[in-house]
């Protein structure tokens, strides 16, 4: 077993995290390293957010080459404003995000935030705009998942690991001006 961060890395976790928690997953997910490594994933997210904003939407390793959107949302339970960096793909003018949690058996916290409070603020590169998170279903969900998995093949593994959970897919629709 290897202890690693979750969240924006999209890696499966055994439990949801709070600052200082350690995340556990099998080394079969292609991670290199020693026996264990304790990582505060909220601190990792904060670092990625700062790097994103300092570099006009670009992030270095381990996110280099992955399209990242910063999504500011309202917490379902806390009512607080929260920001999560998420991998995305596009479909027409919309962004698409997948609540894979790296193939974990449960949905990420941001999934519950989107369901409770679908109005969000997106940061893509240097562009900021309001959007609505729309949960997709059926053929549309399947098509969008397949399209993102074609761009980021690790999502195929996430679907296998999550089974029988069907991983939710959200369309982020720009709000009308």
Regions found by a protein language model. Give the residues of each.
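Extreme N-terminal basic, low-complexity initiation segments
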Residues: 2-11
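Short beta-strand segments
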Residues: 66-102
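Extreme N-terminal tail/first-helix region
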Residues: 25-64
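Short, structured beta-strand-loop surface elements
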Residues: 101-169, 174-175
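Short gly/pro-enriched beta-turn/loop segments at secondary-structure junctions
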Residues: 64-66, 165
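Short helix-to-loop capping/linker segments positioned immediately adjacent to catalytic or ligand/cofactor-binding
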Residues: 58-60, 78, 155-160
């Amino acid at each position: 077993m290897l202890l690693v961060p979750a969240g924006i890395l999209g890696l499966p976790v055994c439990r949801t995290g709070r600052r200082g928690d350690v995340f556990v997953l099998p080394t079969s997910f292609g991670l290199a390293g020693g026996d264990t490594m304790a990582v505060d994933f909220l601190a990792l997210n904060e670092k990625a957010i700062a790097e994103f904003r300092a570099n006009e939407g670009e992030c270095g390793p381990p996110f280099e080459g992955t399209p990242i959107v910063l999504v500011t949302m309202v917490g379902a339970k806390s009512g607080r404003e929260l920001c999560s960096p998420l991998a995305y793909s596009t479909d027409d003018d919309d962004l698409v995000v997948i609540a894979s949690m790296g193939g974990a058996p449960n949905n990420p916290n941001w999934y519950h935030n989107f369901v409770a409070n679908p109005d969000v603020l997106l940061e893509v590169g240097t562009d900021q705009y309001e959007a609505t998170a729309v949960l997709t279903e059926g053929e549309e969900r399947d098509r969008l998942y397949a399209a993102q998995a074609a761009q980021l093949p690790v999502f195929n593994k996430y679907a296998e690991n999550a089974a029988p959970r069907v991983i939710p897919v959200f369309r982020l629709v720009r709000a009308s001006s």
